[in-house]
Amino acid sequence: PGEFTTAINDPKARKELIQQIIAFTKEYKLDGFDIDYEEYDNWDKNFPSLLVFARGLYLAKEKNMLMTCAVNSRWLNYGTEWEQYFDYINLMSYDRGAFTDKPVQHASYDDFVKDLKYWNEQCRAAKSKIVGGLPFYGYSWEESLQGAVDAVRGIRYSGILKHLGNEAADKDNIGKTYYNGRPTIANKCKFIKENDYAGVMIWQLFQDAHDDNYD
């Protein structure tokens, strides 16, 4: 396990980590802090300690400190206790099925909607807490783009436009390159607004187009 997982599984280290996070937030006059735990191996074993850690932070923080989290969208069990400690829950509604050899849409509109409903209906989080995640990147299985992608086939939206042309802006895939174009991003935002969810978050802004006409 990583150092963070080791710390939250040790009561003494967990207490010290909580104290340091609160102290850091105060010292630098931050609005709050975010938990983004992505060590998914042995989830069922480590999640109880993560829940205790979240509760400890919640009890230790000042009332005006924001406490947020980034969570896996739907395939890990957070239960119904997790949501109570957070002001906002940011759903990482992307990367679904992306780390395989099979070309796939990693962030479909349908999955986005299912993720939001899952956290509201199954995890009991209020809509006013739930934030839908939007990817400003995609994945490509095209041999011709292997020099443009990263180690896991990821490619920025700006890179997609650079290599596939500006017409890609209004599509969700070209060949074996999958991403979210402008219409899908707009439709996701529309669903958020019309159904009274908290809002959207972006991963991440620097991956956007460099031309205002296509961002």
Question: Which residues are covered by each model-predicted region?
Answer:
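Conserved, mostly hydrophobic/aromatic
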Residues: I35, I89, G132, I192, ...
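Glycan-binding loop/region signatures in secreted carbohydrate-active enzymes
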Residues: K127-K193, D211, D215
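Receiver (REC) domain switch/active-site residues of two-component response regulators
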Residues: D31, D87, A198
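Short, acidic/polar
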Residues: D10-E27, N72-E81, Y179-K193
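Substrate-binding surface in catalytic domains of secreted glycosidases
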Residues: Q19, E38-L161
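Second-shell loop/turn segments in exported
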Residues: E3-P11, E38-K45, D101-H106, I174-Y178, ...
